Design a protein with these regions (language model features):
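C-terminal active-site "lid" helix and adjoining low-complexity regulatory extension at the edge
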Residues: 250-329
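A transmembrane-helix-recognition feature enriched in membrane-embedded lipid enzymes
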Residues: 1-30
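Short, flexible, glycine-rich and Lys/Arg-enriched loop motifs at helix boundaries
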Residues: 23-32, 63-69, 75, 255-256, ...
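Coil-to-beta-strand transition motifs
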Residues: 129-131, 140-147, 239-242, 255-261, ...
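A short acidic, glycine-rich active-site loop
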Residues: 34-37
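ATP-dependent carboxylate/phosphate-activation module, predominantly the ATP-grasp catalytic core
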Residues: 137-236, 267, 274-297
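Active-site nucleotide/adenylate-binding loops and adjacent lid/helix of ATP-dependent enzymes
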Residues: 31, 41-183, 223-227
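A short glycine-rich, hydrophobically flanked beta-strand micro-motif that places a catalytic Asp/Glu
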Residues: 125, 133-135, 240-254
């Protein structure tokens, strides 16, 4: 997989030379530390939307690391947000679904809080429905932004044959077996169960490619109404010009109409245009998308820098990367 990123890395280095250095990218989203290099202010983005357009974001609260996490504090946040289980818990800093969990009860919550005891944790309403990744961009000189890409995130399901255990279904599935270690752990309590013929078992509840979700190019779903709605939501975050929203909607038709949108995450600089992972898209198509994405990133960042936005030092950038790599204590 790392081989795929070699041409991209070379392309980024060329752009960095042309635009005055790689750290210029830190000016791309003034609302986020280092422009969202490690997406270290997810709560800030979601709470900004929640303040202006509460109907468009999953209810979100924050458990701060300096206050030892406990079930009592979690209960306070849930009461304030009028939430009940299931809920989503996830680190305020992280990528690719790292640490994101669907929590069904207080026992699971206590286990999670123990694992991530020294981490700022997002407490979020669980939203059912179809999940999409919508990549948004806006040049600072332009009054309106645009949707760069849309990805439909499909969650793999096992279909029972009436004779095989769930474990065997996972191991013999052409896609799921690549994620067998993760899926077997997630479903450890029912691996010996034999699903009835035709019964479907959902394997994952989180829209992350590295956790088994299938990404489908959904750019055909873009409409002027949807684009205008995403632009409106984005402007609720002062200083947000570039990144991917992960959102859920009740249906594909609702997405096209810009209705029932619930933002569950707003990512920054290192967002991927995840439509490139659609198996139907060629390698050449993927590179075209990613090259254009990074060209626009440098272009937007340069405009922000010219407008006086701060550029992070290399020390600050390296510190953020190290903090992400350390993970939970």
């Amino acid at each position: 997989m790392w081989i795929f990123y070699i041409p991209i890395s070379i392309h980024i280095l060329i752009l960095a030379f042309r635009y005055g250095g790689i750290r210029q990218l830190s000016a791309i989203n003034p609302c986020m530390p280092n422009g969202g290099l490690v997406d270290s202010n997810k709560a800030g983005n979601l709470l900004a939307i929640q303040a202006d357009l509460p109907e468009t974001v999953a209810k979100t609260g924050l458990l701060r690391a300096e206050l030892p996490a406990s079930l009592a504090k979690l209960d306070e946040v849930m009461t304030e947000l009028e939430l009940s289980f299931p809920i989503i818990l996830k680190p305020n800093s992280g990528q690719r679904g790292m640490g994101v969990s669907v929590i069904d009860d207080s026992t699971a919550a206590e286990r999670y809080l123990t694992t991530y005891k020294d981490t700022d944790i997002l407490v979020q309403e669980y939203i059912d429905g179809e999940e999409f990744g919508v990549f948004y961009m806006r040049e600072p000189s332009s009054p309106n932004g645009f949707v760069f890409s849309i990805t439909h995130k499909l969650f793999p399901k096992m279909t029972g044959d009436g004779t095989s255990t769930l474990e065997r279904l996972i191991l013999e599935d052409p896609r799921a077996h690549y994620m067998a270690r993760f899926l077997l752990k997630q479903h450890a309590e029912q691996l010996e169960r034999i699903p009835e013929k035709g019964e479907q078992i959902e394997m994952v509840e989180i829209g992350s490619h590295c956790r088994g979700s299938v990404f489908i190019d959904a750019n055909a779903y873009l409409t002027p109404v949807l684009e205008a709605r995403i632009d409106e939501i984005s402007k609720a975050i002062s200083g947000y010009y570039y990144g991917r929203y992960d959102l859920r909607v009740s249906s594909i038709d609702a997405l096209k109409q810009g209705k029932d949108i619930k933002i569950i995450e707003a990512n920054g600089l290192t967002s991927e245009s995840t439509d490139i992972y659609d198996p139907k898209n060629s390698l050449i198509d993927a590179y075209k998308v990613v090259f254009r994405q990074w060209y626009l990133a440098f272009k937007i960042a340069k405009q922000n820098r010219i407008n006086g936005e701060r550029v992070s030092s290399y020390r600050e950038i390296l510190s953020s990367v190290r903090s992400l790599n350390r993970g939970p204590s």
